[in-house]
């Protein structure tokens, strides 16, 4: 059974709802891995735009259902996008960025 990563988001931003997300850690690692890959060709990009690009990229490939589940934890699409980005930014600090997407598929 895959390990899970529990991340709680609390913010004063009125556009982001406080939430707790528990999802397979390999989903977050895949997004982070993709973010790092994108940053190779776009070194000037901000971390938010990198993660956003990664989520978009992954959601149109084999990770679609996993990313969809990640986002479905939140109440409204408008707030979900912001909250997911914050969760992923926080995840950067707690999950090792060593795995590649290829190796994660075997989980």
Swiss-Prot record:
It comes from Saccharomyces cerevisiae (strain ATCC 204508 / S288c). Overlaps CCC2. The chain crosses the membrane at residues 16-36, 47-67, 85-105. Disulfide bonds: none annotated. It is found in: Membrane. This is Putative uncharacterized protein YDR269C. GO terms for cellular component: membrane. It is a multi-pass membrane protein. Keywords: Membrane, Transmembrane, Transmembrane helix.
């Amino acid at each position: 059974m895959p390990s899970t990563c529990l991340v709680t988001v609390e913010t004063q931003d009125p556009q982001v709802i406080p939430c707790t997300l528990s999802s397979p850690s390999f989903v977050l690692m895949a997004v982070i891995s993709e973010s790092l890959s994108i940053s190779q060709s776009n070194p000037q990009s901000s971390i938010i735009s990198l993660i956003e690009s990664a989520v978009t990229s992954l959601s149109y490939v084999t990770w679609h259902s996993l990313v969809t589940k990640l986002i479905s934890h939140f109440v409204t699409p408008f707030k979900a996008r912001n909250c997911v980005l914050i969760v992923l930014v926080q995840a950067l600090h707690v999950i090792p960025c060593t795995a590649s997407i290829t190796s994660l598929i075997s989980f």
